[in-house]
Each structure stands twice: as structure tokens, then as C-alpha cells.
Amino acid sequence: MASTRRALVIGTGTGGLASAAFLAKDGFDVLALDAGAEIGGYLAPFSQDGFVFDQGLHYVGACRPGQLVHELFQSLGVDAGELFRELDPDGFDLYRFPDLDVQVCRPLAAYRERLTALFPEETKGLRHFFGLLDGAARMHDALARGILGRPVLTDLVALTGVPALLQWSQRPLRELIEQSTSDERLRAVLAGQSGAWALPPSRVVGLAALLYMAHFSDGAFFPRGGGGGLRDALVHAAEAKGAQFRTRALVERIETERGRVTGVVLAGGERIEADIVVSAVDPTITLGRLVSASDLPTSLRRKAAVIEPSMATFQIWLGMRRDLRTYGLGAQNVWLYPSYDVEEGFSARFTGKLPPRPMLFLSPTSIKDPSGALAPEGSSSLVVLTYVPHARFRKWQSLPEAERGPAYAAYRDEIAQWMLKELDARYPGLVGDVVVQAYGTPLTAADQTRATAGAPFGPAMTLSQWGPKGFRTRTPVTGLYLAGSGVFGGGVAPCLLSGLAASFMAKLAPK
């Protein structure tokens, strides 16, 4: 492997940072480019008045020794045991419905027992659902060991459940839930993590949802220092192997010659030559704008043009001079559903209208990382999130933030008050002693990360877009590879894997 081979990485979110680190580890001369002023994409935090806020990271699974995320970081020379802190093992997720609270615990067997105690008449259906979920967990672990080159004989056991699981690669999660129980409340509980993949149960691929849930089958973790801590660990790992980074470097075009990548051209005309280019931005941008149409099959161009993005978010970042643990929050995520109709919380995505009451997600980041890095002593940082239709903000998207005017500010404030009213109804008195109150709309996400339609999870994991119908690491252009949430899905682990896959493919590329 010649160390003189130049690799360029476009975008420095989790997938781009992982690509840079693995490519540098494999001996490439790496330069990672980001169009923004700061490295990290959704991992890049912002700070105000001593409070530090995450834009997109809430928890990570498979962080124990021998598990996927732990081993990926270890392979890069990062002490994963030091980086990650476990969330509450008895309830890393709390689902709060109108008259029912359910804490998601580890391991899967304990969570199944908890639900069986709550719903004793649904034992058979829970056995069916958790049988598939347990099979997905075994498949997840077997795939992880295979990817890491450490398969074991017992992985063959996971293969016995493949036929039963594979049918759910063609069927939505809602069908599995309805097949398992007719109890309205239990159906809502089994769909409680839907916000994590930003789709209602009727739209998300069943197997994709099962694998996501399985990723947290042995608990959930949060990085010390939040998203910024995770970003810094990846940056340091890449730089330790010689990788370099440039900000304010907007790639305008990926150049090719005879079907092979030759470099990129930046806004302003600067050309940077390369043997390998890994694009870790949305595939619709890479394949729809950066690569010449003549270099791609018509079918792939059409696919990139019609991809449905994941749902956009509206976030409220709160910094408060109070300890939220005294108000009932802990080292966990909280999902607040206004009813047992989980579908309703996502209806805005498809109707363009907001529901009467929002589904809310709470992330008390300063409790998840009690080191003091995210909030001053005696204070707390809190992220409050809901999903909104990007279409409601489209008329302002072409304008710079400073020029969006009072109508945009008024609509932004209206949604924030709608969310805070619901939060106060569910957690009376939680918000107070406020020092920082900032908002992030779908346009904020697009401004800061250039996410298509402000979507934080890349292409939606629907039946027509996930798995074999999704995008691949390899492209028809020799030397051009994809990484990021558009390859294996959103979240830390899929994006880390996308970087590993891009590096692996780059090593195999003809010189």
C-alpha cells in the first residue's frame, strides 16, 4: 500500500471523520474537507454562557468490549472504555404515555419480563416479538464480528433465524406489532423508539427497526463531552495517522477522467487532485450535483433525484441554573407521547400540518455526562426535540439566516411555545431558571450541516429505500465511494461502519 495515494473526504460528520481515520490508518494521504466553519457535522456542539449543547447525538449502543462500536474505536487507537459512559441500565429510554410509563432496560430478557409483568395477557405476542428481536440481536452481533474479522462458531446459531427475520425486510414494523398484539397500549410501547429512526411504524422497514432496537440490547451509552467528545476522539485518531482537515472548503464538483475520479474543484475554482474521493454528504448531493450526469447510469441519477429524506426536526436547547435530577430526570432519554397513537406524532411529515399536540424527545445531556463539561456546576443542559415538516419552512430556505425576517422568527417562536406548553403539561415546573434558550429549525440543520431538507438521518428507511434498495459504498465511478448516513443508515454505528467500508473499498481500488 503506497502511502503517496491521496484520498479526499467530503464532509466531516461521523461518516466522514470515520472515513478519514480509517483511510489514514490504512496508509493514505488524507485531506478531509468541510464546507462549514467547524468540523463535525451533527457532532459539532455549540456553547453559550458556559453551557454546551449537542445538535444530534443522544446515545450509542454496542460500546462494551468485544462489541461493534467499542472495537471500531479501539481499532483506531481510541480508548472506548474511557470515552463512553453507560446510561441508566434500568431505564436508558423512558416512554411516557398518558397513563403509562415504561422504562426500557437491559438486557432484552429483562425488558421482556418487564413488559410481560405489565401486560400479562400478552405473553404469547411478546414471546413472538422478542423472539424476532433476540434473533436480530444475534444477527447484529454476528455481522459485527464478521465485519471486524472475528467470527466465532456460535455465529452459525444466528443464521438459523435469518429466514424469519428476512421477511421483515419487505414488511413494515407496524405489521409485526399488529401481528404480536391487539392491545393498543402495548402496540404503542413496542413502537416507542420510532423517533430514533424518524418514521412511523407504518413506514419503517421492520428489519431495520429490529436491528436498531437490537443495537441497544445490552444497554446505551453517551460519550464524555457529548458529541464534541466523540468528534474530537475521531479527529485525534485521524490526525495521529497523518490526516489533515480543512474548513470553509465547499466542494463544487467531483472531477473524473475516463470513468475514474481525479479530484475535486472547490467553490472559487481551486482544484485538488486525488486518487480516491469519499463523499460523506447526502447521496442526493453527491450523485445529483457533484458528479457529472455522464458518469452515472440514468437509473442511479433518477434514484438520487427522488429519494425521500428522513423527517426534519425542531430543537429547543435549554441551559438552566438548576439540577434537573431533582425534577425527575435521569441519565436517560424521555419520549413523551400525547396519546397511544404513535403514528399521529409523525403525521406532520405527510400532511404538512402539525398535530394538535407534539410528540417530544428529551435529552438531559448534562446528566448523561456528569463530568461538568456540558453545564456549569449546579446547572443543567437539556435538549427538547420534535419532528416537523420541512415544507413549513421551505419559503425561507433560500435566504441567509439574517434575512429570513420577522415572519420566520414568529413561526419559529410559535412552534417553540407549542412544544414548551406540552412539556410543562407533562413535566410541570421542569423549565425554569433559564439562562440559555436557543432554537434549531430544519433550516438551522441545513445551514450548519447542509442536510437535505434539514433531515438528520439521511434517506428515510422505507421499504423502497433501505437495504438492497438503498445506496452502496461503491459507485460506478472508479475511486469514488460513499459514506455517512446515506449508506447504512443514520446513527453513530452505521456511520462508523460506512467509513470502515469506504476505506476497505479504497484499498481494493486499482492504482
Feature roles, as predicted:
Residues 210-261, 265-267:
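Helical element adjacent to the flavin cofactor pocket in flavoenzyme catalytic cores
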Residues 183-197, 357-361, 420, 425-489:
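A glycine-rich dinucleotide-binding beta-alpha-beta segment and adjacent secondary-structure elements
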Residues 57, 485-507:
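A conserved FAD-binding loop/helix module that cradles the flavin
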Residues 3-138, 459-461:
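N-terminal glycine-rich phosphate/pyrophosphate-binding loop and immediately adjacent elements
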Residues 64, 164-173, 216-236, 246, ...:
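Short beta-strand to alpha-helix junction loop
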Residues 252-376:
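Mid-domain catalytic core of redox enzymes
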